[in-house]
Amino acid sequence: MINMRKSHPLMKIVNNAFIDLPAPSNISSWWNFGSLLGICLLLQILTGLFLAMHYTSDTSTAFSSVTHICRDVNYGWIIRYMHANGASMFFICLYMHVGRGLYYGSYTFLETWNIGVILLLTVMATAFMGYVLPWGQMSFWGATVITNLLSAIPYIGTDLVEWIWGGFSVDKATLTRFFAFHFILPFIITALVLVHLLFLHETGSNNPTGIPSDADKIPFHPYYTIKDILGVLALFLALMLLVLFSPDLLGDPDNYTPANPLNTPPHIKPEWYFLFAYAILRSIPNKLGGVLALIASILILLLMPLLHTSKQRSMMFRPISQCLFWLLAADLLTLTWIGGQPVEHPYIVIGQLASISYFSIILVLMPVAGMIENKLLKW
């Protein structure tokens, strides 16, 4: 009798994606982040659903409804902090996943990579809108500052901002629509994830060497299912350590003060996972220039396949490119640190240098390194 998992129309899809999928035999733990992102998304949807049952998206009650969740709802505090810190874990996994793609040349799978960049932008938009919902000081002022950036668009900017706000400032209408978008976007993300996987399974996974692995494949189950479970356990350990011991470590104390349009916090800054982009935004004195640099800092990922000059796909055997990659990683950490600092000397100059370095490494140094390494191959 034919195996049901191979014949049933629904089970066949699951089987071909998670059970009998031919996978390279040598993929390292850097390939765990895809499944971890799936788990993070599931966790965020579940915790978010339970939070939405008790949250009210009205300016007069939003802050107190979050307080009510933490104080009065059964295990509401753990649901709330798992959702807030789950977002941080989500972004850690996202950045690791993108970094893996850059290092091992996975961006040569064009469709998979482009959908991935769209996913990154969608997740960033979702996280930004989620940060506005508790309606604390940083929620309100973060929403005001970031949405206001759109006013830098020539001619239509001001009208566009007022259209997004639903009035002349961030108010009731803004909060309500942000809640609606924050609720629906994770489901759109889930659909995009399926498209991402669909394109990935057209080509099969990359591997650390960057060499085609068709001659050496193993079934996904049990080898990589057990490996993914280990990754999930490590993720949950890290998440629960954060949630149970220092749930507010990555948050901003200002967000425990209810939103007040008449009182501006001394340092307006987004969540830690946006600080690198925020630092790039602030490093340019011109408003429109800053906004363009901010957008470019993410969309530059779309250029990666065009900037690949090396004859080798992976950086595994390319020491010069490896040095530049880790320099880029250090540069992003520097930008993250600068984004959280006040706009004063010496932080301004450090931020500008780090921003120039970011674009220089990606647009100039890495392609040049690839060409140099091609020359070295002939020696």
Swiss-Prot record:
Membrane disposition: Multi-pass membrane protein
Binding annotation for a ubiquinone: H201
Annotated heme b b562 binding sites: H83, H182
Entry's Gene Ontology molecular function annotations: metal ion binding; ubiquinol-cytochrome-c reductase activity
Annotated residues for binding of heme b b566: H97, H196
Record field: transmembrane: 33-53, 77-98, 113-133, 178-198, 226-246, 288-308, 320-340, 347-367
Co-factor note (free text): Binds 2 heme b groups non-covalently.
InterPro entries: Cyt_b/b6_C (IPR005798), Cyt_b/b6_C_sf (IPR036150), Cyt_b/b6_N (IPR005797), Cytb/b6-like_sf (IPR027387), Cytochrome_b (IPR030689), Cytochrome_b_C_euk/bac (IPR048260), Cytochrome_b_N_euk/bac (IPR048259), Di-haem_cyt_TM (IPR016174)
Quaternary data: The cytochrome bc1 complex contains 11 subunits: 3 respiratory subunits (MT-CYB, CYC1 and UQCRFS1), 2 core proteins (UQCRC1 and UQCRC2) and 6 low-molecular weight proteins (UQCRH/QCR6, UQCRB/QCR7, UQCRQ/QCR8, UQCR10/QCR9, UQCR11/QCR10 and a cleavage product of UQCRFS1). This cytochrome bc1 complex then forms a dimer.
Entry protein name: Cytochrome b
Species per Swiss-Prot/TrEMBL record: Tragulus javanicus (Lesser Malay chevrotain)
